[in-house]
Structures are given as structure tokens and as C-alpha cells.
Amino acid sequence: MRRKDREVTDPVKIADIINRCSCCRIGFDDDGEVYIVPLNFGYEAKDNTYVFYFHGATVGRKIDLIHKKPKVGFEMDTDLAVYAVNGSDVACKYTARFQSIIGNGIVSIVSDIEEKRRGLSLVMEHNTGKREWDFDEKMINAVAVIKLEVIKMSCKEHQ
């Protein structure tokens, strides 16, 4: 990271930033064409290892790319605001407040029914705040649960 003064390394603060993000964008390489998909998500972190879960249709371009090229980039951000420094009316005196996370990892389709249930529960918890969810097997089998195992991730903020 070029701007070390903006780097966030505290795991508690990183978790706070992730918890306030509502969308994670995954970028795929589709034979030289970048394909970016915005997704709602849930996650778990253990010992500075992050795993994100998403859900979606069982067929389509995203699913095809997961099978074809599972190494992806991802991005999420929150608290974005553009403002003038010291009330200036000069274009170059504007800046942006933000918190963001970028990284790369490996995506896969979850096949284990219990891990699918866990992934869906994490997605719902992140988006609603409610921890306990019941999913019958028919519901679980109707969707793809996608797992992103993070290889590298950085967090940055500017106030």
C-alpha cells in the first residue's frame, strides 16, 4: 500500500469496517475481459483468516467463471463522502472520506449441505442482524452458495 498512513491493520477495526459494508464486488478475469459482480455477503474471520459467503443462481456467467478461473479480486467500501477541505471552492481542494477493503482469493461453489446452511446464515446475519435462520433442504438446494477464501486483503481509510 502506497499510503501507509491510511492503512488499517487492527483486526477489530477491520471487522467494524466489513460489518458496515453492504456489498462486496467480485472481479473475474473472463479471457481478458474484466467481469465485476456486486453481491451481498456474510463472512467469518478466525486468526486473521477471512472467508466470505455469497448466494445466487445456480447457473450463469458468474458460476461458469467460478469453475473456469476461481482466482478473483474483490472490493468493498463504506462511509464515502466527497467534501471541500477547509470549505474551499477550488476543485483540487476536494477530497473523499472513505473506508475500503480490497484483496484477492479463491472462489468455489459450496456443495456440503451444512456449509451451505452456515454460509446462508452468515449472509442473512450480516444483512439483517438476526443470527438464527432455518433453511429447509429444498431452499438450500435451489441456490448456489459461493465461498471466497481470502489469500490477501488490505484495508484503508481516509477521514
Question: Would you name each region that the model predicts?
Answer:
Residues S22-C24, V37, N48-Y50, K68-V72, ...:
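A generic structural signal for short beta-strands and their flanking turns/coil linkers
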Residues R2-R3, A81-Q159:
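Charged, gly/pro-rich active-site loop segments
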